[in-house]
Amino acid sequence: DESEQTVSEIDEVTVTEEKVVPAGKRLFNNPNTETTEISKKYKKDRNNETPEGEPITSIDTENSRDIADVYESLEDSPNDPKVQEAYSLMADETAAQHQEIIDAGYEVEIWNGEGEPYANAQEMIDDVRDNKHMWIYSTEAGFGDTAITEEQRQQNKLLQDSGFKDKNGNTLLYNDLFRFVHDFFGHTERGNGFGPVGEENAWDVHSRMYTPLARRAMTTETRGQNSWVNFGPQMRNDKGELIKKGEEGYLSPRERAFAPQKMALMP
């Protein structure tokens, strides 16, 4: 789950030579070039030959609606052995990715201030590139719309202590690590923003670093949840059509509900 870490950026547009698009409105920002080197090293060390992929500049809304429908239909299955295995693998692989980033000299710090730590994606990328630092929201402070239950903590390895600390010695859950590594690899490699197209890029980049079963859990936590938020039932009218900006019933990114939390595997 990355719900509290996502800063919604509205009206994503492509940067062109004719028009300088301000930070916060860009589809792609200036990336952190070292991110690609760290990602390639991680994959090479694990014989991961998944191709790099290409930047995504537009989103297929029909496909995103279908993904949202799949997420909506998923049954929360925390006791399913395959689901347990997938989430455990995802947690372990996320920890290994976190270690790779830390070994390269970067730091993560839990944000306890008011509002958002960054006004837009470029500010986050600049912090990573210039200061080797990233703020994240604590999972304990925000896990969807509700607090973590003890039952969820026992069932889901992502909600357990990872053994890592932030730069101030605060405990990091595996899901805290995921919020960090997902924004690090998913957003700073291509420089993509946080809107729907940016999140599709983040999933596309970062999912390639996981093994197949772990990737399915990771996809549930990213592409599945994001598609539900942006293209799910809350964004449709009585006819099932997507409500466009300016139409009655449209919800701005900050008004949208978080996706319901589920331990399940996207196809």
Model-assigned labels for residue ranges:
Residues E2, V13-T16, S73, S77, ...:
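Surface-exposed polar/charged interaction patches
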